[in-house]
Amino acid sequence: MKISATYFKQYIPLLLLIMISFSSKAQYFGQNKVRYKKLDFKVLQTPHFEIYYYLKNENMLKRFSQDAETWYKMHQEVFRDTFLTKNPIILYNNHPDFQQTTALQGEIGIGTGGVTEALKNRVIMPVMELNSQTRHVLGHELVHAFQYHVLLEKDSISLENVGKTPLWMVEGMAEYLSIGKKDAFTSMWMRDAMLNRDIPSLKDLTNSNKYFPYRYGQAFWTYIGSQYGDTTIVPLFKNTAKYGYENAIRYTFGYDDKTLSGLWKNSIDAHYKPMLKADSSQIKITGTKIIDNKNAGNMNVAPAISPDGKYVAFMSEKDLFGIDLFLADAKTGRIIRKLTSQISNGHIDDFNFIESAGAWSPDSKQFAFSIFSHGKNQMMIINVANGSTVSQTAMNQVQQFGNLTWSPNGKDVAFSGMVEGQSDIFSYNLDTKEITQITNDVYSDYAPSYSPDGKKIVFSSDRAAIQNKNINAALPINLAIYDISAKEVKNLDVFPGANNLNAQFSSDSQNIYFLSNRDGFRNLYKYNFDGNTVDQLTDYFTGISGITEFSPAISVSGTDDIVYSYYRYQRYTLYNAKLSSFKAKRIGNQEENFDAAILPPMENYGVNIINSNLNNFDRFEKIVADSMKTVA
């Protein structure tokens, strides 16, 4: 059975990639899957879909259904194809439920965001933590539904031929049609490739496992769509499935794949090289390198520095048997011990490591983090001194949660979690064992962090974008402050069109450090409450990043030591820097320029269907209630 998956958007060493989940080219092996609860699915019919759901959140279900129909209209303009029967979508309320699906055999890893079957053409996916993620995964998977429909049903191409289509073509096309050419995250990858003088040819993409197909495939299709027009995409894709990519390129463009590879490379160089400053300041890294591929792995992510600044906990594939949680000296990088491991700890089915980080207790003696165990996320707290488990706690109805933060008085742990497809901020009291829901609204609230004085919680949210009636397919992620005593949320009016994430308070609670792509790059910023001012602290050509754009990549100690994950050479390296080490530059709160986020070429020389539609996603006419009915 040929299937396609989305959202694990990052290259990691091949062994780990297979171990975690990369189902686009893989077969499932038919393992028996443990089910922890029975789900009572209903069926909602829309003009072009049958949505199998058990979600009780009617507003979320309505929005999902409307998005599915909008994606259908947008993809139909590109594929020029119509579904004669309603396409099935199986929707899970959260990722832990999705991992237990019986619609597919075999294990689904924490990194698989969605699956589309070739033969049944079913889309199987969960509601994601962020509204924009759910929308993107749905759009991505529906591209696969169109791909399979147009190849297998309309053109009668054999499943074997479809399976031979290069993965970078299949997945890259799904990324381009669901994200477009404005993507700061993929642009970071392309700048890294240019800087490393390692821009692959199409032959390299096809034959080597070195280049992650989602990112490079998206960049390739952006080039094709921008240079030759989006009307070229489907003919090239269909010809590739029929004749192979070399013959398809020659048939479509009149020259060979080597020539097209050269043209694509020249476009990348011409776009990004002028952005590289002559003084090399953008590749001079601030701080001390503490964790890299010499003392750990290639993927060293989710750093969390202890409040006293002595230790850093992080996730790494150091031992090549999967992702483990390690403890290191925050000053020297010396690995002290492995805190816990999925292999050695039978209570851990998986670490919630891709877009989540753990939290230290105020006394730096305990560490809390999110795991996947027995069909749901649970909070595990360990004693750092000896690695023993202090507690393991399920959060009742909050079956998916992550990005923990420990209150300065030591009594509460706050986190972002999902209930009925809605992402909010919660807190858990360690004494009373009670869960308090801090936010409760349609907005996606994500990655909270306590202020050291215990008065505020900062988090990321799409509330400002939704309140301002954003019409793009992508919803910008802005910063918000929760006043604990007043129980009020206030938006910070900083870089409104950017994604502003991973916010952390300074030790005096007067500043917030955060990551932003406000200029198309991914750098560290500091916001000051008193002056309502923003300083840019880094100016890197690649960027500070985790596995995905939404992954935690910075952590701040009680002494304002900042540990961050720097992306270069397709690897993640941890640095530790004092605040005084950064060269701060004052910039305007509204100062944005996304040229560096645009995948090349900058201009569209052909018919621009995809990006125009993505920029006007919410201007498409929405289906009304009369077009939706529950039939079972």
Regions found by a protein language model. Name each.
Residues I335-Q342, V390-A394, T436-T439, K490-D493, ...:
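Beta-propeller fold detector
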Residues A330-G333, N383-G387, N429-K433, D483-K487, ...:
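Short loop/turn segments that connect beta-strands within beta-propeller blades
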Residues N32-R35, F41-V43, S208, P235-K238, ...:
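Beta/coil-rich, acidic/histidine-enriched accessory regions frequently appended to metallopeptidases
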Residues N295-N298, M315-F326, I343-F353, A368-M380, ...:
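A flexible loop/linker signature enriched in serine peptidases of the S9 family
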Residues R586-A632:
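Outer-membrane beta-barrel initiation region
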Residues I51, H75, W168-D183, R191-D257:
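Active-site-proximal alpha-helical
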Residues A26-P166, A184-F185:
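Juxtacatalytic substrate-recognition/specificity segment
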Residues P303-Y311, G358-Q366, N403-D412, P448-K456, ...:
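Blade-terminus and WD-like Trp-Asp/Gly-His loop motifs, strongest in beta-propeller folds
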